[in-house]
From Swiss-Prot:
<dbReference type="GO" id="GO:0006633">
    <property type="term" value="P:fatty acid biosynthetic process"/>
</dbReference>
<keyword id="KW-0443">Lipid metabolism</keyword>
<feature type="active site">
    <location>
        <position position="50"/>
    </location>
</feature>
<dbReference type="GO" id="GO:0016020">
    <property type="term" value="C:membrane"/>
</dbReference>
<protein>
    <recommendedName>
        <fullName>3-hydroxyacyl-[acyl-carrier-protein] dehydratase FabZ</fullName>
        <ecNumber>4.2.1.59</ecNumber>
    </recommendedName>
</protein>
<dbReference type="InterPro" id="IPR010084">
    <property type="entry name" value="FabZ"/>
</dbReference>
<comment type="function">
    <text>Involved in unsaturated fatty acids biosynthesis. Catalyzes the dehydration of short chain beta-hydroxyacyl-ACPs and long chain saturated and unsaturated beta-hydroxyacyl-ACPs.</text>
</comment>
<comment type="similarity">
    <text>Belongs to the thioester dehydratase family. FabZ subfamily.</text>
</comment>
<keyword id="KW-0456">Lyase</keyword>
<keyword id="KW-0441">Lipid A biosynthesis</keyword>
<dbReference type="InterPro" id="IPR029069">
    <property type="entry name" value="HotDog_dom_sf"/>
</dbReference>
<keyword id="KW-0963">Cytoplasm</keyword>
<dbReference type="Pfam" id="PF07977">
    <property type="entry name" value="FabA"/>
</dbReference>
<dbReference type="GO" id="GO:0005737">
    <property type="term" value="C:cytoplasm"/>
</dbReference>
<dbReference type="GO" id="GO:0019171">
    <property type="term" value="F:(3R)-hydroxyacyl-[acyl-carrier-protein] dehydratase activity"/>
</dbReference>
<dbReference type="InterPro" id="IPR013114">
    <property type="entry name" value="FabA_FabZ"/>
</dbReference>
<keyword id="KW-0444">Lipid biosynthesis</keyword>
Length: 142
């Protein structure tokens, strides 16, 4: 649905912090959600130090990938185009598995509430159909 170049037209993130490669499904009218993925490569900069002998994607970057997925949904809405997304909080974070080089990290974020410039998204990241991370992400738009 959206390739990396189209994603970069919507969200401000860039390498090495752009953590969504493709959007495969998006709904912003009724049920506001985005589904996409990140192909996790052995060449990711964070694997140099986390951990060199047994590389694992840091959990905080899994949450960031979910937040970016939600950001695609939010900034695709006409009223929020051109705004800057900011973290306002993270709740109910759970890590349930490892993400390692070669994994396809499937990302889903549904916007469950928006009031003014503040909102909440529910994100789920999975590998091979198994949830590895879930979080409730609070955001603010400037």
């Amino acid at each position: 649905m959206l390739n990396i170049n189209e994603i970069k037209k919507i969200i401000p993130h860039r390498y090495p912090m752009l953590l969504i490669d493709r959007v495969t499904e998006m709904e912003i009218e009724e049920k506001q959600f985005v589904r996409g993925y990140k192909n996790v490569s052995a060449n990711e900069a964070f694997f140099q130090g986390h951990y060199p002998e047994e590389p694992i994607m840091p959990g905080v970057l899994q949450v960031e990938a979910l937040a970016q997925t939600g950001t695609v949904a939010i900034l695709s809405m006409e009223r929020f185009k051109g705004k800057t997304p900011l973290f306002a909080g993270i709740n109910k974070v759970r890590f349930k598995g490892k993400v390692v080089p070669g994994d396809k990290l499937d990302l889903y974020c549904e916007i469950i509430k928006i009031k003014g410039p503040i909102g909440i998204g529910k994100g789920i990241a999975s590998v091979d159909g198994k949830t590895v991370c879930e979080a409730e992400i609070l955001f603010a738009l400037q």
